[in-house]
Amino acid sequence: MTPALPTTTTQVQQGRLGRLVVARLKPNEDVIDSAEALCASHGIACAVVRGGLGSLIDGELRYHGEHGHQAIHVPGPGIEILSLSGEVIAGRSHLQAVLADADGKLFAGCLQRGRNLSFITVELTLQEWLPD
């Protein structure tokens, strides 16, 4: 018997894109916390992550697998961010990433809040989302 897939809720929202914020994180800054702080400092309630790159001390991801939520620890230092996308909303941000370790092994999942600290630098591009 095939296990039942989790029920998901999809929300469709109309709106438009607003201001663009491009920022460089300093060492030891968490990606999610920093993205939320950047938005707050510019009066942005919701933003789309247009991109991100840089390196993390360690990578901490999660994904929903066959047996519920699974964690992935990517030991560093020097974990490279190859892809970063998602949405930034104060306290509810959801960022998906593809990371590579020093051997080039790839890992994908959702960043865990407070556990993905910039190593040397991380660059983020965020764009304001203005719902109708």
Give names to the regions the model predicted.
Residues 1-51, 56-94, 98-132:
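N-terminal intrinsically disordered, cationic/polar leader segments
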